[in-house]
UniProtKB/Swiss-Prot annotation:
Pfam families: Dus (PF01207). The gene is dus. Belongs to the Dus family. The keyword ATP-binding does not apply. It catalyses: a 5,6-dihydrouridine in tRNA + NAD(+) = a uridine in tRNA + NADH + H(+); a 5,6-dihydrouridine in tRNA + NADP(+) = a uridine in tRNA + NADPH + H(+). The lineage of its organism: Bacteria, Pseudomonadati, Pseudomonadota, Alphaproteobacteria, Rickettsiales. Its EC number is 1.3.1.-. InterPro entries: Aldolase_TIM, DUS-like_FMN-bd, DUS_fam, DusB-like, tRNA-dHydroUridine_Synthase_C, tRNA_hU_synthase_CS. This is Probable tRNA-dihydrouridine synthase. FMN binds at P17, M18, S19, Q72, K141, N202, G203, D204, G226, R227. Its cofactor is FMN. NCBIfam families: nifR3_yhdG (TIGR00737).
Length: 327
């Protein structure tokens, strides 16, 4: 089983940090489906130390379980990242994850995210400053490198491990690929062979078969699932079950899915309030219903609704109609 410092994960299937997706309520939900670790949305370190409302909301954690209290920080200033890490530790975080992988132009333009892979000296300073600032484990998520000519993830992983970082996650693409092409799980094996700390494979893990293939090709200690959980938070438990038993675990029934969605919807509204919560919930509703009969009409209707009670009633009505059609 994977250990991050003194924290042992119950599963080697991890939920990836995703901006505007892995908020507190979504992490709670996926954790209930057996994720070994759930990671917060990326938080800008400078905004964190300024205690901006958005950053404080993003760093909210579940205090009863260390594997539910991992906060991801982004930035390019070692002292600022270190201060933000200490601040999160003081608020209860049990793991700090450093973002060296985000390919977004806005992030890279600020010399953060995957741009850090182009400056190994700066990366070293960030690793060392963060590890020194906190007593909790520090991990890092990166890509293979900036482009095909600079695939330096193995080198950066060695630097990270030497600096005291205790786990490395590698997305099997370069920054310049963004999300095009296929994730190169074979390359992750090179990273795994370069360090003794746990290495996690990430990228294109959307079903049972791909999860197994990613582990086999990468030799990684575990896998991190990202976009595959859109509308399927239960995928984490299905993958974990398949990797353990070799058998496929069926998805929840439509009735069970309705219960999951309603509880998730209620949690979003309670956490964010009505005016903010409904727009946030919409994207999840769209993903949940994707592929179901008449879902296009349902999604169009929900997109025009702002009253939280009406939206909830529409969800129930739609799923009941799907159940009736399946009788």
């Amino acid at each position: 089983m994977i250990k991050i410092g003194n924290i042992e994960l119950s599963s080697n299937v991890i939920l990836a940090p995703m901006s505007n997706i892995t908020d507190l309520e979504f992490r709670k939900l996926v954790k209930r489906f057996g994720a070994g670790l759930v990671v917060s949305e990326m938080i800008a370190s400078r905004a964190m130390i300024m205690k901006s409302r958005q950053s404080m909301q993003k760093c909210a954690i579940m205090h009863d379980d260390p594997t539910s209290a991992c906060v991801q920080l982004a930035g390019c200033e070692p002292d600022v990242i270190a201060d933000a890490a200490k601040m999160n530790e003081d608020m209860g975080a049990k793991i700090i994850d450093l973002n060296f992988g985000c390919p977004a132009k806005k992030v890279v333009g600020g010399y953060a995210g995957s741009a850090l892979m182009r400056d190994e000296r700066l990366a070293t300073k960030i690793f060392e400053a963060t590890v020194k600032a906190v007593k909790i484990p520090v991990t890092v998520k990166m890509r293979m490198g900036w482009d095909d000519n600079t695939k330096n993830a193995p080198t950066l992983a060695v630097i990270a491990a030497s600096s005291g970082v205790q786990m490395v996650t590698v997305h099997g693409r370069t920054r310049c690929q963004f999300y095009s092409g296929n994730a190169n799980w074979d390359f992750i094996r090179v990273v795994k062979e370069a360090v003794k700390i746990p290495v996690i494979a990430n990228g294109d893990i959307t079903n049972f078969a791909k999860a197994k293939e990613a582990l086999q090709k990468s030799g990684a200690d575990g896998i991190m699932v990202g976009r595959g959980v859109y509308g399927k938070p239960w995928l984490i438990s299905q993958i974990a079950y398949y990797l353990k038993t070799g058998k496929e675990k069926p998805a929840p029934s439509i009735a069970e899915q309705l219960d999951i969605i309603i509880k998730h919807y209620d949690a979003i509204i309670d956490y964010y309030g009505k005016s903010v919560g409904v727009p946030i919930a919409r994207k999840h509703i769209i993903w949940y219903s994707s592929g179901l009969p008449s879902s296009a009409e349902f999604r169009c209707a929900v997109n025009l609704m702002n009253d939280p009670i009406a939206v909830k009633e529409k969800i129930a009505e739609f799923y009941m109609s799907v159940m009736d059609a399946n009788k």
